[in-house]
Amino acid sequence: MDIALLLKWILCQKVRVENAMTIKLENQLLNIKNGRNFRELGGYQTKDGKTIKKHKLIRTANLASLDENDLKYLQDYGVKYVVDFRSKDEVEREPDRVPEGATYDFDPVFSEDLTDSSKGIDEVLSQDNKDPKAGYNHMFIAYDDMIKSESAQRAYRKFFDVLLANDEENRSVIFHCTAGKDRTGFAALLALSALGVPLDTIKQDYLFTNAATTDFVNSFLQKAKDEGASDANLSNIKDLQTVHPEYIDHVIETLQQNYGGVENYLHDMMKLTDEEISKLRKIYLN
């Protein structure tokens, strides 16, 4: 085969795979009209060829803006548990609207919102920060705290307790923070890792937040610009409202360097036993 033709064929296959993954990720979005980043984790394949069941595991942003139709949709979808990773102040500002019949679990990862994802735009602008990388750099500190702080580890262990309790078919756990990207993203990494989902899939799920929240972020940035935000402020707002590959790469590297990898973290810091991991896979995998 001609080398040029071979390279062209390889490129075509790569594009097809990437397109297939994009379509798959778009299909993960739930039909919620008044919330953002509502995503089904069912359908992802594990390393050994099993598949996460639908109607079992859902990652979202907060539930504060849901209307009655959204609540009915989630009730019909089978939502049984809502795990809220936000701080007390965040919850008081924007309390969740919980579907009828679902149990609400207040499970704060931090005592305050270190990701800044819920701070009002006026507060962000009032910081008068000239460093356009301040928001980007701040996120690495926030992720370190998610991994290492005792409060975060307790919260994520409680999250696993809820996952283990959700043993009825077609009953879902919603887990969320404010934007559904950082605290929720780390929770998704832990849960998907425990279920045996490949790291490449976990990364793509994490990064899909940007596509899922494009309209919201653009609107947020436009409002900031209209209110006179500097270029540095706009850069920081964007970095606080989106995800970067470097964030999840940092998480994975930190887990490897400090704990020997995510599997060891699940056993040693989450205190998940082999029996509990087997139970999780029985509950959530086909």
Question: Residue spans of the language-model regions?
Answer:
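Cys-dependent protein tyrosine phosphatase-like superfamily
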Residues: 10, 15-174, 187-286
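Ser/Thr-glycine-rich phosphate-binding loops at phosphate-binding pockets of nucleotides
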Residues: 179, 183-184
